[in-house]
Amino acid sequence: MNEKMSFSQLLALSLMLFALFFGAGNMIFPPAMGQLAGTNVGAALAGFIFTDVGLPLLAIAAVVFANRSLDTMAGRAGEKFGRFFIILIYLLIGPLFAIPRTGSVSFEMVVTPFLGADTNPLIFSVIFTAIFFTAVYFLSANPSRIVAIVGKVLTPVLLIAIFIIGLTAVINPIGPLGEPVGDYNTIAFFKGMVEGYAAMDALAAGIFALIVIQNVEAMGIRQEKNIIKYTMLAGLFAAMGLAVVYGILAFVGATAGPLGEFTNGGQLLSAVSKHMFGTAGMLILGVAVLFACLTTAIGLTTACGEYFSDHFAKLEYNHIIIAVVLFSFVVSNVGLTQLLSITVPGLLMVYPVLMALVISGFFDKWFKGRQPIYAGILIGSALISIPNGLEALCATYGIDVTAMSNILQMVPLYNLSLGWVVPAIIGGILGYIVSIVKK
């Protein structure tokens, strides 16, 4: 049987996956990173792309080769761990971090630029996010073609706006590349790698992979090798698109020095848009971002509602999305900068474990499904990632944890944000020994 997908079908599939990945965080983190990286923006961008393009692509592959099952991939270290980790991922890309961020970014891009310096933004934020999340609830409770239409129309508009800003920045840059700040002076690649965590695409990649696989099968592709082939091609093309957009946004941030310093990427992009195209340009970009964020929020809310209602019989879909929307509304009003400062420590705890899980999955042929090996790898990575996240959280709130920091600095590669690697390898070796003894 000669199964073949047309180019237009593959392009549509790739654009769909790109749109799934391209949310609020993808807009604000690259320019903010570029602003701090300055002349080292290339190295920082490479690190960012490694964790926010490369790792999601690996995660898609890991799910595809794990019998196209998220449960299989996550459950290799144990069924209970697998269930716990999947729930944690849904909470992180749902009401804890990603959904609230869509409201915060929308407010930052659409409303904040028009507020006076003496205006209290909280009142306006509460009103705006109340309207935003009410819309999210009704569109999630009543799935409609409006969401698909908005996604198909607004994503291209947003991309066109980004490319126009990027082209203008290249032809007529606002200023020269700035000077690197802090760790961007010495370890720009590894600093960019950690910044890539914040977009959270790798967390969602496994879920998105299942959506792509469903669409591939809906296009009449049935053979296993062809499902793998077209899913991976869609992932590759989407990844290439993300890398190009990140490069544009990072360059814009790196050359925006004359406009001043900004506390987050949303403020920076608004200022750049206003500088290049005036208030109208800033408003057009803001509205495009608003609808992109709205579409993302609806998709994530729906995903959370479907997962928890399917896996927990006593939970009703409508009750879940109400809880998700209300919690997201409250969290979104802490402010974008504050929300980001809380997000990073949490991701520092989770991402190394996810990376260990994804990478180790490619060695299943040699591990032969031995659960103790996977458990050892994940425990080893968590022994460093959790203290690392706690250290970052304490630093955010000015809590002195010098003793813990001194101990962590003794771990190989810790200063490069790769302190989890050696403990994960040691844990895997110990797990292998345990599996041999048990056998």
Regions found by a protein language model. Name each.
Residues A32, G82-G116, C293-D310:
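Hydrophobic transmembrane alpha-helices that form the core helical bundles
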Residues F65-M73, I131-L154, A218-I221, V330-I342, ...:
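Membrane-water interface regions at transmembrane-helix termini and the short interhelical loops
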